Amino acid sequence: MSVDNNQRDLEAGIHTDLQGRLTYGGYLRLDQLLSAQQPLSSPPHHDEMLFIIQHQTSELWLKLLGHELRAAIGFLQRDEVWQCRKVLARSKQVLRQLTEQWSVLETLTPSEYMGFRDVLGPSSGFQSLQYRYIEFLLGNKNAQMLQVFEHDPAGQAQLRTVLEAPSLYEEFLKYLARFGHAVPAVYEAHDWTQPHVADDALQPVFERIYQDTDRYWREYALCEDLVDLETAFQLWRFRHMRTVMRVIGFKRGTGGSSGVGFLAKALELTFFPELFQVRTSLQAAPPAEQA
């Protein structure tokens, strides 16, 4: 099909009288959203707009990720496995989007960044409340992080709430216990503010599931969803570190951290350690007995 005059005419049914009615821009509050990019460099450095939008869009995706992970926890609490799997699948795609987004910031050269870096002062992505919130939801609890938000009592209170509640993984362990798996009783109630660390007592639970996936398919599928989620998150962390290395090398971060070295340490953190350890300890299932 060709358009002779290279113009697409409005169809008769398209709404054009929008006075006083809900519009696309009104629904999305684009007047507020698109006026939030305010470069501080003077005169405005061309590439500061990229830097601002990169981080603002990341925060929007993080908001959605937190929304989905809270839903996943709720579904687990109600034993709604398929609904939980759906939002975990969406969460993985959000993380993929966040990871690929670094390729845009990678177009920022070191000299371009140095042209406006000074105006950032001590501000840093390290201070992202939503990032810490998601880490806590996934089990990387660290009460020290609350200190970073002393300037924001409301945000600090929000972070404290998730610090003191069971993480996604802890809710998964409680789900397994409800369905007859030998999860130690300590996971029913303990100090939720502590990060989860690898527990040898959980290994038999996951070996049982992985050795008989037909029998425990729901549990196995959820395990693999969590493995996908952690892998996606770690890829995002890795891409972040490499982007920072590419743009600033080994300079200190604006927030006072060692920069790349500090980001690299995050790659050593894990959310669901037993789900990776079981791959080492797993043995072939014994052959079925012949009748």
From Swiss-Prot:
Essential cofactor(s): heme
SUPFAM superfamilies membership: Indolic compounds 2,3-dioxygenase-like
Note on cofactor: Binds 1 heme group per subunit.
Signal peptide: none
Single GO molecular function: tryptophan 2,3-dioxygenase activity
InterPro entries reported for this sequence: Trp/Indoleamine_2_3_dOase-like (IPR037217), Trp_2_3_dOase (IPR004981)
Cystine crosslinks: none
Pathway: Amino-acid degradation; L-tryptophan degradation via kynurenine pathway; L-kynurenine from L-tryptophan: step 1/2
Annotated keywords: Dioxygenase, Heme, Iron, Metal-binding, Oxidoreductase, Tryptophan catabolism
Function: Heme-dependent dioxygenase that catalyzes the oxidative cleavage of the L-tryptophan (L-Trp) pyrrole ring and converts L-tryptophan to N-formyl-L-kynurenine. Catalyzes the oxidative cleavage of the indole moiety.
Similarity comment: Belongs to the tryptophan 2,3-dioxygenase family.
Identification of the protein by name: Tryptophan 2,3-dioxygenase
Lineage: Bacteria, Pseudomonadati, Pseudomonadota, Gammaproteobacteria, Lysobacterales
Protein's gene: kynA
